[in-house]
C-alpha cells in the first residue's frame, strides 16, 4: 500500500474524530467507521493481488467476494455522496478542507479497488 494513502487515511480519520457537528456526530462516527472498514477492505484486496496465489484462497474462503466487492462500491458511492453533502452544508473551513481531502481520498481508493479487482478477475 502507498504510504501516502496510509497517512491520508490516518489524517482524515483523525481530523473527522476532532469535529464537533452537534446532533450529527452519530452520522460522522458512522462515516469514520465506514472509512476504517473501507481501508481494511482495500488493504486486503491489495495484499491478495500481491500474492496472486491468494486469489484461490480468497475465492474459496468467500465464494461471494464479487458480491462483497459490489457492496464496497455501493459504500464508496454512499460515502462520496455523504461527504459531498457535508461539504455543501458546512461553512467551517477546517471541515471543508477535511471533507475535500476525504472526497479526494475516496476517489483514489475507489480507483485502487477497481484496479485490484480487475487484477483478481
Swiss-Prot record:
Residue ranges of the motif Nuclear export signal: 12-21, 85-94
Assembly information from the UniProt record: Interacts with protein M1. May interact with host nucleoporin RAB/HRB and exportin XPO1/CRM1.
Recorded family membership: Belongs to the influenza viruses NEP family.
GO cellular component annotations of the record: host cell nucleus; virion component
SUPFAM superfamilies attached to this UniProt entry: Nonstructural protein ns2, Nep, M1-binding domain (SSF101156)
Biological function: Mediates the nuclear export of encapsidated genomic RNAs (ribonucleoproteins, RNPs). Acts as an adapter between viral RNPs complexes and the nuclear export machinery of the cell. Possesses no intrinsic RNA-binding activity, but includes a C-terminal M1-binding domain. This domain is believed to allow recognition of RNPs bound to the protein M1.
Protein name: Nuclear export protein
GO BP terms: exit of virus from host cell nucleus through nuclear pore
Keyword Cell membrane in annotation: no
Signal peptide limits: none
Compartments in which it is found: Virion; Host nucleus
Predominant location: virion
Gene: NS
Alphabetical UniProt keywords: Host nucleus, Host-virus interaction, Transport, Virion
Amino acid at each position: 500500500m502507498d504510504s501516502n494513502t496510509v497517512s491520508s487515511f490516518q489524517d482524515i480519520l483523525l481530523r473527522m474524530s476532532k469535529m464537533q457537528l452537534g446532533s450529527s456526530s452519530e452520522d460522522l462516527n458512522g462515516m469514520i467507521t465506514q472509512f476504517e472498514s473501507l481501508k481494511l477492505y482495500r488493504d486486503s484486496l491489495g495484499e491478495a493481488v500481491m500474492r496472486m496465489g491468494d486469489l484461490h484462497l480468497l475465492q474459496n474462503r468467500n465464494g461471494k467476494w464479487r458480491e462483497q466487492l459490489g457492496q464496497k462500491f455501493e459504500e464508496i458511492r454512499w460515502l462520496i455522496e455523504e461527504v459531498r453533502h457535508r461539504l455543501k452544508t458546512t461553512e467551517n473551513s477546517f471541515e471543508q478542507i477535511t471533507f475535500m481531502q476525504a472526497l479526494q481520498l475516496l476517489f483514489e481508493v475507489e480507483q485502487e479497488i477497481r484496479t485490484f479487482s480487475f487484477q483478481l478477475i
